[in-house]
Protein backbone atom coordinates (compact mmCIF):
# COMPACT_ATOMS: atom_id res chain seq x y z
CA UNK A 1 0.00 0.00 0.00
CA UNK A 2 1.28 3.47 -0.91
CA UNK A 3 1.36 5.54 2.28
CA UNK A 4 2.86 8.66 0.66
CA UNK A 5 -0.47 10.41 -0.11
CA UNK A 6 -1.74 9.61 3.38
CA UNK A 7 1.44 10.97 4.96
CA UNK A 8 1.33 14.16 2.87
CA UNK A 9 -2.29 14.71 3.86
CA UNK A 10 -1.55 14.21 7.56
CA UNK A 11 1.44 16.56 7.49
CA UNK A 12 -0.51 19.24 5.61
CA UNK A 13 -3.43 19.07 8.01
CA UNK A 14 -1.18 19.19 11.05
CA UNK A 15 0.78 22.16 9.70
CA UNK A 16 -2.42 24.15 9.19
CA UNK A 17 -3.25 23.76 12.90
CA UNK A 18 0.05 25.34 14.02
CA UNK A 19 -0.29 29.14 13.75
CA UNK A 20 3.36 29.81 14.63
CA UNK A 21 4.62 27.43 11.95
CA UNK A 22 2.19 28.86 9.42
CA UNK A 23 3.34 32.39 10.26
CA UNK A 24 7.03 31.48 9.99
CA UNK A 25 6.52 29.82 6.62
CA UNK A 26 4.53 32.82 5.38
CA UNK A 27 7.22 35.24 6.51
CA UNK A 28 9.93 33.17 4.84
CA UNK A 29 7.95 33.14 1.60
CA UNK A 30 7.46 36.87 1.93
CA UNK A 31 11.18 37.52 2.31
CA UNK A 32 11.91 35.35 -0.74
CA UNK A 33 9.26 37.20 -2.70
CA UNK A 34 10.59 40.62 -1.70
CA UNK A 35 14.13 39.67 -2.70
CA UNK A 36 12.97 38.56 -6.10
CA UNK A 37 10.90 41.61 -6.93
CA UNK A 38 13.36 44.10 -5.46
CA UNK A 39 15.48 43.79 -8.58
CA UNK A 40 12.50 44.34 -10.87
CA UNK A 41 11.53 47.54 -9.09
CA UNK A 42 15.04 48.95 -8.75
CA UNK A 43 15.93 48.43 -12.40
CA UNK A 44 12.63 49.92 -13.61
CA UNK A 45 13.31 48.55 -17.08
CA UNK A 46 10.24 46.31 -17.25
CA UNK A 47 12.23 43.10 -17.56
CA UNK A 48 11.16 40.13 -15.43
CA UNK A 49 13.56 37.29 -16.08
CA UNK A 50 13.43 34.54 -18.68
CA UNK A 51 10.10 33.00 -17.65
CA UNK A 52 7.25 33.81 -15.27
CA UNK A 53 6.80 32.07 -11.92
CA UNK A 54 3.53 30.74 -13.21
CA UNK A 55 0.87 30.86 -15.88
CA UNK A 56 -2.81 31.55 -15.32
CA UNK A 57 -4.66 29.76 -18.10
CA UNK A 58 -8.19 30.90 -18.89
CA UNK A 59 -9.26 27.48 -20.08
CA UNK A 60 -12.62 28.67 -21.42
CA UNK A 61 -14.82 31.73 -21.36
CA UNK A 62 -17.99 29.70 -21.40
CA UNK A 63 -20.10 29.83 -18.24
CA UNK A 64 -23.34 28.21 -17.13
CA UNK A 65 -24.32 30.95 -14.64
CA UNK A 66 -25.24 34.64 -14.83
CA UNK A 67 -23.60 36.33 -11.85
CA UNK A 68 -24.69 39.92 -11.24
CA UNK A 69 -21.23 41.27 -10.35
CA UNK A 70 -18.91 39.22 -12.58
CA UNK A 71 -16.03 41.43 -13.70
CA UNK A 72 -15.45 39.38 -16.86
CA UNK A 73 -19.14 39.23 -17.73
CA UNK A 74 -18.66 40.96 -21.08
CA UNK A 75 -16.07 38.34 -22.07
CA UNK A 76 -18.30 35.33 -21.39
CA UNK A 77 -20.27 33.15 -23.80
CA UNK A 78 -19.41 35.08 -26.95
CA UNK A 79 -21.07 33.28 -29.84
CA UNK A 80 -18.80 30.69 -31.44
CA UNK A 81 -15.73 31.74 -29.47
CA UNK A 82 -15.38 28.30 -27.89
CA UNK A 83 -14.13 27.04 -31.25
CA UNK A 84 -10.89 28.94 -30.60
CA UNK A 85 -10.07 26.88 -27.49
CA UNK A 86 -6.75 25.19 -28.10
CA UNK A 87 -7.04 21.47 -28.92
CA UNK A 88 -4.87 19.28 -26.71
CA UNK A 89 -2.24 18.69 -29.38
CA UNK A 90 -1.87 22.43 -29.96
CA UNK A 91 -1.84 23.01 -26.21
CA UNK A 92 1.10 20.63 -25.88
CA UNK A 93 3.07 22.64 -28.43
CA UNK A 94 2.03 26.04 -27.08
CA UNK A 95 3.23 25.52 -23.51
CA UNK A 96 6.90 24.82 -22.75
CA UNK A 97 8.31 21.66 -21.23
CA UNK A 98 9.41 23.37 -18.04
CA UNK A 99 9.22 21.10 -14.98
CA UNK A 100 8.23 22.98 -11.85
CA UNK A 101 6.26 25.72 -13.61
CA UNK A 102 3.01 26.51 -11.83
CA UNK A 103 -0.19 26.70 -13.82
CA UNK A 104 -3.54 27.81 -12.45
CA UNK A 105 -6.87 27.37 -14.18
CA UNK A 106 -9.74 29.81 -14.33
CA UNK A 107 -12.48 30.98 -16.68
CA UNK A 108 -15.43 31.17 -17.29
CA UNK A 109 -16.49 27.95 -15.70
CA UNK A 110 -13.65 25.60 -16.53
CA UNK A 111 -15.80 22.46 -16.44
CA UNK A 112 -17.86 23.79 -19.33
CA UNK A 113 -14.86 22.70 -21.36
CA UNK A 114 -15.42 19.01 -22.06
CA UNK A 115 -11.73 18.15 -22.39
CA UNK A 116 -10.66 20.01 -19.23
CA UNK A 117 -9.35 16.83 -17.59
CA UNK A 118 -7.21 16.27 -20.69
CA UNK A 119 -5.94 19.85 -20.38
CA UNK A 120 -4.83 19.14 -16.81
CA UNK A 121 -3.17 15.92 -17.86
CA UNK A 122 -1.17 17.78 -20.52
CA UNK A 123 0.16 20.14 -17.87
CA UNK A 124 0.89 17.30 -15.45
CA UNK A 125 2.88 15.42 -18.07
CA UNK A 126 4.96 18.57 -18.62
CA UNK A 127 5.94 18.50 -14.96
CA UNK A 128 3.82 21.48 -13.92
CA UNK A 129 1.90 21.82 -10.67
CA UNK A 130 -1.58 23.34 -10.54
CA UNK A 131 -1.58 25.97 -7.80
CA UNK A 132 -5.33 26.29 -7.93
CA UNK A 133 -8.40 26.07 -10.07
CA UNK A 134 -11.58 28.09 -9.66
CA UNK A 135 -15.03 26.66 -10.24
CA UNK A 136 -18.64 27.29 -9.33
CA UNK A 137 -18.83 23.57 -8.51
CA UNK A 138 -22.16 22.94 -10.21
CA UNK A 139 -20.97 20.41 -12.77
CA UNK A 140 -18.44 18.35 -10.81
CA UNK A 141 -19.82 14.89 -11.53
CA UNK A 142 -18.47 11.58 -10.20
CA UNK A 143 -15.98 11.18 -13.06
CA UNK A 144 -14.55 14.65 -12.58
CA UNK A 145 -14.42 14.30 -8.80
CA UNK A 146 -12.47 11.05 -9.08
CA UNK A 147 -10.10 12.52 -11.66
CA UNK A 148 -9.45 15.64 -9.57
CA UNK A 149 -8.76 13.55 -6.49
CA UNK A 150 -6.35 11.42 -8.50
CA UNK A 151 -4.52 14.53 -9.75
CA UNK A 152 -4.25 15.75 -6.16
CA UNK A 153 -2.95 12.38 -4.96
CA UNK A 154 -0.26 12.53 -7.67
CA UNK A 155 0.86 15.93 -6.36
CA UNK A 156 -0.34 17.94 -9.36
CA UNK A 157 -3.49 19.66 -8.07
CA UNK A 158 -3.04 21.67 -4.87
CA UNK A 159 -6.15 23.77 -4.30
CA UNK A 160 -9.71 24.16 -5.53
CA UNK A 161 -11.59 27.40 -4.88
CA UNK A 162 -15.37 27.13 -5.08
CA UNK A 163 -17.37 30.33 -5.56
CA UNK A 164 -20.30 30.74 -3.15
CA UNK A 165 -22.10 33.97 -2.31
CA UNK A 166 -24.23 33.03 0.68
CA UNK A 167 -26.82 30.59 1.99
CA UNK A 168 -29.00 28.61 -0.38
CA UNK A 169 -31.54 31.01 -1.91
CA UNK A 170 -29.26 34.05 -1.69
CA UNK A 171 -26.55 32.23 -3.62
CA UNK A 172 -29.06 31.18 -6.28
CA UNK A 173 -30.23 34.78 -6.72
CA UNK A 174 -26.68 36.14 -6.99
CA UNK A 175 -25.75 33.44 -9.51
CA UNK A 176 -28.86 33.93 -11.59
CA UNK A 177 -29.88 30.25 -11.74
CA UNK A 178 -32.24 28.47 -9.32
CA UNK A 179 -30.84 25.33 -7.68
CA UNK A 180 -27.22 26.46 -8.04
CA UNK A 181 -26.39 26.09 -4.34
CA UNK A 182 -27.62 22.50 -4.16
CA UNK A 183 -25.70 21.54 -7.29
CA UNK A 184 -22.55 23.16 -5.89
CA UNK A 185 -22.99 21.36 -2.55
CA UNK A 186 -23.45 18.04 -4.35
CA UNK A 187 -20.33 18.62 -6.45
CA UNK A 188 -18.31 19.45 -3.35
CA UNK A 189 -19.49 16.31 -1.57
CA UNK A 190 -18.41 14.17 -4.51
CA UNK A 191 -15.03 15.87 -4.57
CA UNK A 192 -14.45 15.53 -0.83
CA UNK A 193 -15.45 11.88 -0.81
CA UNK A 194 -13.15 11.09 -3.71
CA UNK A 195 -10.24 12.96 -2.10
CA UNK A 196 -10.79 11.24 1.26
CA UNK A 197 -10.84 7.82 -0.41
CA UNK A 198 -7.42 8.51 -1.93
CA UNK A 199 -6.05 10.39 1.10
CA UNK A 200 -5.29 13.18 -1.36
CA UNK A 201 -3.84 16.39 0.19
CA UNK A 202 -6.31 18.64 -1.62
CA UNK A 203 -7.16 22.05 -0.17
CA UNK A 204 -10.71 23.22 -0.80
CA UNK A 205 -11.89 26.72 0.05
CA UNK A 206 -15.06 28.67 -0.58
CA UNK A 207 -14.66 32.05 -2.20
CA UNK A 208 -17.13 34.89 -1.72
CA UNK A 209 -17.36 38.52 -2.78
CA UNK A 210 -18.37 41.74 -1.03
CA UNK A 211 -21.44 42.79 -2.99
CA UNK A 212 -24.56 44.83 -2.26
CA UNK A 213 -26.83 41.85 -2.83
CA UNK A 214 -25.11 39.58 -0.30
CA UNK A 215 -23.44 41.93 2.19
CA UNK A 216 -25.94 41.51 5.03
CA UNK A 217 -25.45 37.74 4.96
CA UNK A 218 -21.66 37.83 4.73
CA UNK A 219 -21.15 36.52 8.27
CA UNK A 220 -23.35 33.53 7.40
CA UNK A 221 -20.59 32.23 5.13
CA UNK A 222 -19.06 30.49 8.16
CA UNK A 223 -22.20 28.38 8.53
CA UNK A 224 -22.15 27.71 4.79
CA UNK A 225 -18.53 26.56 4.96
CA UNK A 226 -19.27 24.26 7.90
CA UNK A 227 -22.32 22.86 6.14
CA UNK A 228 -20.14 22.06 3.13
CA UNK A 229 -17.30 20.60 5.21
CA UNK A 230 -14.83 23.33 4.20
CA UNK A 231 -12.39 24.94 6.65
CA UNK A 232 -11.27 27.99 4.65
CA UNK A 233 -12.99 31.12 3.34
CA UNK A 234 -11.52 33.54 0.83
CA UNK A 235 -13.09 36.99 0.57
CA UNK A 236 -12.82 39.20 -2.47
CA UNK A 237 -13.54 42.86 -1.97
CA UNK A 238 -15.66 44.18 -4.81
CA UNK A 239 -13.53 44.97 -7.84
CA UNK A 240 -14.63 48.07 -9.73
CA UNK A 241 -13.47 51.26 -11.42
CA UNK A 242 -15.12 54.55 -12.26
CA UNK A 243 -15.51 55.75 -15.87
CA UNK A 244 -12.95 58.48 -15.12
CA UNK A 245 -10.42 55.91 -13.88
CA UNK A 246 -10.94 53.85 -17.02
CA UNK A 247 -10.47 56.90 -19.24
CA UNK A 248 -7.27 57.93 -17.46
CA UNK A 249 -5.87 54.41 -17.69
CA UNK A 250 -6.60 54.29 -21.42
CA UNK A 251 -4.71 57.59 -21.79
CA UNK A 252 -1.71 56.36 -19.79
CA UNK A 253 -1.58 53.15 -21.80
CA UNK A 254 -1.92 54.92 -25.11
CA UNK A 255 -4.73 52.51 -25.99
CA UNK A 256 -7.22 53.23 -28.75
CA UNK A 257 -10.30 52.94 -26.55
CA UNK A 258 -11.71 51.48 -23.33
CA UNK A 259 -12.38 48.04 -24.85
CA UNK A 260 -9.02 46.87 -23.47
CA UNK A 261 -10.27 47.36 -19.89
CA UNK A 262 -12.24 44.49 -18.36
CA UNK A 263 -13.76 45.36 -15.00
CA UNK A 264 -17.03 46.38 -13.37
CA UNK A 265 -17.35 50.08 -14.28
CA UNK A 266 -19.59 52.26 -12.11
CA UNK A 267 -19.77 55.61 -10.34
CA UNK A 268 -21.67 53.97 -7.49
CA UNK A 269 -20.93 50.42 -6.33
CA UNK A 270 -23.89 50.65 -3.94
CA UNK A 271 -21.84 49.81 -0.86
CA UNK A 272 -21.62 51.91 2.29
CA UNK A 273 -18.11 51.68 3.77
CA UNK A 274 -19.42 51.54 7.35
CA UNK A 275 -21.68 48.60 6.51
CA UNK A 276 -18.85 46.82 4.72
CA UNK A 277 -16.58 47.32 7.73
CA UNK A 278 -19.19 45.94 10.13
CA UNK A 279 -19.99 42.89 8.05
CA UNK A 280 -16.38 42.01 7.23
CA UNK A 281 -15.45 42.32 10.91
CA UNK A 282 -18.35 40.03 11.84
CA UNK A 283 -17.16 37.47 9.31
CA UNK A 284 -13.56 37.62 10.55
CA UNK A 285 -14.65 37.29 14.19
CA UNK A 286 -16.87 34.32 13.42
CA UNK A 287 -14.09 32.62 11.45
CA UNK A 288 -11.81 32.95 14.47
CA UNK A 289 -14.47 31.58 16.80
CA UNK A 290 -15.11 28.55 14.62
CA UNK A 291 -11.52 27.83 13.58
CA UNK A 292 -12.12 28.68 9.92
CA UNK A 293 -9.08 29.96 8.03
CA UNK A 294 -9.66 33.34 6.42
CA UNK A 295 -7.98 35.46 3.76
CA UNK A 296 -9.04 38.41 1.66
CA UNK A 297 -7.95 40.09 -1.55
CA UNK A 298 -6.97 42.79 -1.91
CA UNK A 299 -5.81 43.44 1.65
CA UNK A 300 -8.21 46.29 2.41
CA UNK A 301 -7.15 47.17 5.93
CA UNK A 302 -8.91 49.61 8.25
CA UNK A 303 -7.03 52.81 7.22
CA UNK A 304 -8.08 52.50 3.58
CA UNK A 305 -11.49 50.83 3.71
CA UNK A 306 -13.45 54.08 3.40
CA UNK A 307 -11.36 55.17 0.42
CA UNK A 308 -11.69 51.77 -1.23
CA UNK A 309 -15.49 51.96 -1.23
CA UNK A 310 -15.64 55.67 -2.09
CA UNK A 311 -15.60 55.90 -5.91
CA UNK A 312 -12.85 58.11 -7.28
CA UNK A 313 -10.73 58.07 -4.13
CA UNK A 314 -7.05 57.80 -4.93
CA UNK A 315 -5.39 54.65 -3.62
CA UNK A 316 -1.69 53.93 -3.86
CA UNK A 317 0.22 50.70 -3.88
CA UNK A 318 2.00 48.37 -6.25
CA UNK A 319 1.17 45.51 -8.55
CA UNK A 320 3.73 42.84 -9.37
CA UNK A 321 1.34 40.46 -11.12
CA UNK A 322 2.73 41.12 -14.63
CA UNK A 323 6.25 40.52 -13.29
CA UNK A 324 5.32 37.09 -11.93
CA UNK A 325 2.43 35.56 -13.86
CA UNK A 326 1.58 35.25 -17.53
CA UNK A 327 -2.12 35.49 -18.33
CA UNK A 328 -2.98 33.19 -21.23
CA UNK A 329 -6.42 32.92 -22.80
CA UNK A 330 -8.14 29.79 -24.10
CA UNK A 331 -6.91 30.64 -27.62
CA UNK A 332 -3.25 30.94 -26.62
CA UNK A 333 -3.21 34.74 -26.72
CA UNK A 334 -1.40 36.29 -23.75
CA UNK A 335 -2.68 39.45 -22.09
CA UNK A 336 -1.00 41.96 -19.80
CA UNK A 337 -3.29 41.12 -16.88
CA UNK A 338 -6.91 40.15 -16.09
CA UNK A 339 -8.12 43.79 -16.16
CA UNK A 340 -5.94 45.24 -18.90
CA UNK A 341 -6.60 43.06 -21.94
CA UNK A 342 -3.79 44.30 -24.13
CA UNK A 343 -2.41 41.42 -26.17
CA UNK A 344 1.28 40.88 -25.46
CA UNK A 345 1.83 37.74 -27.52
CA UNK A 346 0.43 34.48 -28.85
CA UNK A 347 1.67 31.08 -27.70
CA UNK A 348 0.54 29.46 -30.93
CA UNK A 349 3.11 31.60 -32.76
CA UNK A 350 5.76 32.36 -30.12
CA UNK A 351 7.37 30.57 -27.22
CA UNK A 352 6.42 31.59 -23.68
CA UNK A 353 9.93 32.99 -23.26
CA UNK A 354 9.56 35.11 -26.40
CA UNK A 355 6.23 36.46 -25.18
CA UNK A 356 7.47 37.10 -21.63
CA UNK A 357 10.60 38.95 -22.77
CA UNK A 358 8.96 40.65 -25.76
CA UNK A 359 8.96 44.42 -26.15
CA UNK A 360 5.19 44.83 -25.70
CA UNK A 361 5.19 43.06 -22.33
CA UNK A 362 8.39 44.79 -21.18
CA UNK A 363 7.14 48.24 -22.21
CA UNK A 364 3.84 47.82 -20.35
CA UNK A 365 5.63 46.60 -17.21
CA UNK A 366 7.94 49.59 -17.38
CA UNK A 367 4.95 51.92 -17.66
CA UNK A 368 3.30 50.20 -14.68
CA UNK A 369 6.37 50.76 -12.50
CA UNK A 370 6.57 54.40 -13.57
CA UNK A 371 2.94 54.99 -12.57
CA UNK A 372 2.95 52.93 -9.36
CA UNK A 373 -0.39 51.47 -10.35
CA UNK A 374 -2.80 52.47 -13.10
CA UNK A 375 -6.14 53.96 -11.96
CA UNK A 376 -8.07 50.78 -12.83
CA UNK A 377 -5.63 48.78 -10.69
CA UNK A 378 -6.74 50.47 -7.46
CA UNK A 379 -9.52 47.99 -6.74
CA UNK A 380 -8.16 44.81 -8.26
CA UNK A 381 -7.65 41.55 -6.38
CA UNK A 382 -4.00 41.46 -7.51
CA UNK A 383 -2.94 44.84 -6.11
CA UNK A 384 -0.93 45.42 -2.92
CA UNK A 385 -2.46 48.54 -1.43
CA UNK A 386 -0.75 51.04 0.86
CA UNK A 387 -0.81 51.82 3.70
CA UNK A 388 -0.68 48.35 5.23
CA UNK A 389 0.49 46.78 8.42
CA UNK A 390 3.21 44.15 8.70
CA UNK A 391 0.50 41.55 9.24
CA UNK A 392 -1.15 42.62 6.00
CA UNK A 393 2.02 41.72 4.14
CA UNK A 394 2.60 38.28 5.63
CA UNK A 395 0.87 36.42 2.82
CA UNK A 396 2.83 36.47 -0.41
CA UNK A 397 0.57 38.03 -3.05
CA UNK A 398 0.89 34.93 -5.15
CA UNK A 399 -1.75 34.12 -7.71
CA UNK A 400 -3.64 32.06 -5.15
CA UNK A 401 -3.79 32.30 -1.38
CA UNK A 402 -7.41 31.54 -0.38
CA UNK A 403 -9.30 34.27 -2.17
CA UNK A 404 -9.11 33.30 -5.81
CA UNK A 405 -10.49 36.32 -7.51
CA UNK A 406 -13.86 36.53 -9.14
CA UNK A 407 -14.33 34.18 -12.04
Kindly label every feature range from the protein language model:
Residues 62-64, 110, 139, 167, ...:
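Short, solvent-exposed loop/turn segments at secondary-structure junctions
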Residues 55, 59, 160, 206-208, ...:
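A structural signal for short, well-ordered beta-strand segments
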Residues 51, 83-90, 179-183, 213-217, ...:
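Soluble or luminal CAZymes and related metallo-dependent hydrolases
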Residues 88-106, 113-237, 244:
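Radical SAM/AdoMet-radical enzyme domain recognition
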Residues 54, 58, 205, 234, ...:
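Amphipathic alpha-helical recognition patches that constitute DNA-binding helices
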Residues 7-10, 37-51, 307-322, 327, ...:
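Flexible mid-to-C-terminal extensions adjoining Fe-S/redox cofactors in radical SAM and related proteins
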Residues 48, 197-203, 243-336, 380-385, ...:
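A C-terminal junction/extension of Radical SAM enzymes
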Residues 5-158, 407:
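Conserved alpha-helical substructure of the radical SAM core
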Amino acid sequence: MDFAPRLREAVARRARTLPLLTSLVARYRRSQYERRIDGFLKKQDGEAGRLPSGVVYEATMRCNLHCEFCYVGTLLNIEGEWREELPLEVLKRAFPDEAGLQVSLTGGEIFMRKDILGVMEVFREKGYTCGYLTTNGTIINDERAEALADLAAKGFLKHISVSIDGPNELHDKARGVKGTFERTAAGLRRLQQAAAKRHAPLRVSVNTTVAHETLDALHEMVGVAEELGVDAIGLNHLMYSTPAEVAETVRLLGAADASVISTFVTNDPGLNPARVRTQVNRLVARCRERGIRFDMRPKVKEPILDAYYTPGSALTGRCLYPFLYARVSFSGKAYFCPFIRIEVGDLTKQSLEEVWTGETYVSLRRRLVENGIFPVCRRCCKVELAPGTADALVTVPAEEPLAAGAQ
